[in-house]
Amino acid sequence: MERIEFISRRASDTVFIGECIGRGSTAGDVFLLRGELGAGKTQFVKGLAKGLDVSDWEHVVSPSFTLLNTYDGKIGLCHVDLYRLEGADVTELGIEEYLDTAVVAVEWAEKSLWWDNTMKVSITVNEQEERRIVLEVVDAGRAKVWRDIRCES
């Protein structure tokens, strides 16, 4: 497993990091986002949407109550929030339907089991309110794609 780390000093940095990763994403990529409330998971997904050329990326919101939102871009984006769900409920969302045609971003992913082709995104906040964003990638070839993208604002 390869780890790629980023530091975000403000929300716009988190969006930019997500955008860079979105530019290198392909249909079937699954991002499992973990972090406390307010850590920046939804800001990261806004960036993914921007990188996937979703026209209304600024309007991406956490699907806390709808549970699953989809967006059209050069590649579709399926945004899921599992905060309010228990394990058995997750299978009923139909996330598998999007795995061939979209990038899937799952907030509160620690609440379920997942597929092999996943990237874990952990966001932690330090005392200075900086976000440490760690992308864990199983496939070394995929890790190279994101390492080669310049994510410096």
Where are the regions a protein language model picked out?
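N-terminal pre-Walker A segment at the start of P-loop NTPase domains
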Residues: 1-20
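Short phosphate-coordinating micro-motif centered on Lys-Gly-acidic
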Residues: 4, 88, 96-153
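Phosphate-binding P-loop
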Residues: 22-27
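Hydrophobic anchor at the beta1->P-loop junction of P-loop NTPases
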Residues: 31-33
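P-loop (Walker A) phosphate-binding loop of NTP-binding proteins
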Residues: 36
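Conserved lysine of the Walker
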Residues: 41
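Post-Walker A helix-loop "phosphate-sensing" segment adjacent to the P-loop in P-loop NTPases
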Residues: 50-59, 73
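Conserved nucleotide-sensing/catalytic segment adjacent to the nucleotide-binding pocket
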Residues: 60, 64, 68-110
